[in-house]
């Protein structure tokens, strides 16, 4: 079915691009490496363009709840290991192309029954989210910026031909699940209930195509603080021998297929004494992400000495992190009045090395849902360690500490803010 479409597209391109080619000087066509002329990209993929149908509304009024008859004992908070303890229940919603979204169900946590030919197993039709529920001092349950997670999950699903959904309805259903399993939310500061919404293609077929059926489910896991005894700065290996994402790819979507290929490079970095990879891209060695987090660096401008908080732009090669956006918003609100410049632009590993050599490197940290922020001590690059500004006795810079405190204040309801969603 695809070949006739591609043939027609090629024919259209030939007719449409002929006038463009005719206007390009011959020298530009030959000397692309030295000419300033570049061909214009004719097409690009956007989330909405990838949707085969309009979002089909979920119906929360059809929710059924079946509670477990064998509730699990609660673990002591200090015994919690990330992602290894799960609550009593899960939310699941089936979809098929004929009926759309079926009635949502909250049931006891259980195994899935899938055909071995399900498309998720063969062609990676899978996307997910990571978000958390918290208890404030009054025992009220709160979610942190869940609308951003719903938006991103829809974008990820659309990019791999999975169905979209009404984000407000799914958020309401997730809140219902959280309330059913509220006893699993630890009350101590730094603890939370990690939520994992996941969507998979379930159609029984070995053919490569958009799945005709899918499953959206949500599981929950009580977790402790990423740094239980306080910050512990990490060391990174600048990685250019493997690529996490590339222009026109899916590095900005939260797909499982983006994560598995990163494990071997991480193991290699760990074998050399580094905790994470700092992913570089291209001959210029642009800094993109750190491990599974967005990357921030604080530098002094070489010409003016002004303080700058710098992070890579949303160019399609990095994830649209919810914590990243929160850090940027807080920085513009609280740091900009103090003279900081908050900048989203491409920057290179050479820039960071030069800043360190010249004493202009203030600090660096990663940002993500699991840790909020993760301070960076040093980066291994081209056989040398690039110092990221921390003193020997320090495990965190001033900015990373402030960001963690500012974000936690809104997560736990100490500061009433629109980012906090009460269940």
What are these regions (language model features)?
Residues 36, 40, 168, 176-187:
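An exposure/low-complexity boundary signal
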Residues 3-5, 9, 44-177, 205-423:
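Helix-start/capping segments and mature chain N-termini
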Residues 1-53:
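N-terminal mitochondrial targeting presequence
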Residues 180-183, 188-213, 224:
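Non-catalytic, conformational "gating/processing" segments within enzyme and secreted inhibitor domains
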């Amino acid at each position: 079915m695809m070949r006739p479409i591609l043939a027609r597209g090629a024919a259209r391109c030939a007719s449409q691009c002929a006038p463009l080619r005719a206007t390009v000087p011959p020298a530009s066509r030959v000397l692309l490496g030295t000419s300033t002329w570049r061909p214009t990209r004719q097409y690009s993929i956007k989330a909405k363009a990838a949707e085969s149908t309009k979002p089909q509304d979920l119906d929360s009024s059809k929710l059924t709840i079946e509670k477990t008859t064998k509730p699990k004992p609660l673990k002591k908070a200090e015994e919690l290991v990330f992602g290894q303890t799960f609550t009593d229940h899960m939310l699941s919603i089936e979809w098929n192309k004929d009926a759309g979204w079926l009635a949502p169900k909250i049931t006891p946590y259980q195994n899935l029954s899938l055909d071995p030919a399900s498309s998720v197993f063969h062609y990676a039709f899978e996307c997910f989210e990571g978000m958390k529920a918290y208890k404030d001092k009054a025992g009220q349950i709160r979610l942190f910026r869940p609308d951003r997670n719903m938006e991103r999950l829809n974008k990820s699903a659309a990019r791999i031909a999975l169905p979209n959904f009404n984000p407000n309805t799914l958020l309401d259903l997730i809140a219902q699940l959280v309330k059913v399993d509220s006893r699993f939310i630890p009350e101590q500061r730094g603890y939370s209930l990690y939520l994992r919404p996941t969507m998979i293609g379930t159609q029984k077929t070995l053919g490569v195509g958009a799945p005709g059926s899918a499953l959206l489910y949500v599981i929950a896991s009580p977790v402790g603080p990423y740094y239980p005894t306080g910050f512990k700065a990490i060391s990174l290996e600048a990685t250019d021998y493997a690529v996490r994402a590339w222009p026109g790819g899916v590095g900005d979507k939260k797909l499982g297929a983006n994560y598995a290929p990163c494990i071997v490079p991480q193991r290699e970095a760990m074998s050399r004494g580094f905790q994470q990879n700092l992913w570089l891209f291209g001959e210029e060695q642009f800094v993109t992400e750190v491990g599974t987090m967005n990357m921030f660096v604080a530098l002094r401008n070489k010409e003016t000495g002004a303080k700058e908080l710098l992070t890579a732009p949303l160019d399609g090669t990095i994830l649209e992190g919810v914590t990243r956006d929160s850090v940027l918003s807080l920085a513009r609100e609280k740091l900009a009045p103090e003279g900081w410049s908050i900048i989203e632009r491409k920057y290179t590993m050479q820039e960071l090395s030069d800043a360190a050599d010249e004493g202009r490197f203030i600090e660096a940290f990663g940002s993500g849902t699991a840790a909020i922020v993760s301070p960076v001590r040093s980066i291994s690059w081209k056989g040398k360690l690039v110092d990221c500004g921390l003193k020997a006795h320090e495990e965190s810079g001033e900015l990373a500490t402030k960001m963690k405190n500012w974000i936690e204040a809104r997560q736990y309801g100490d500061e009433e803010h629109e980012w906090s969603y009460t269940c």
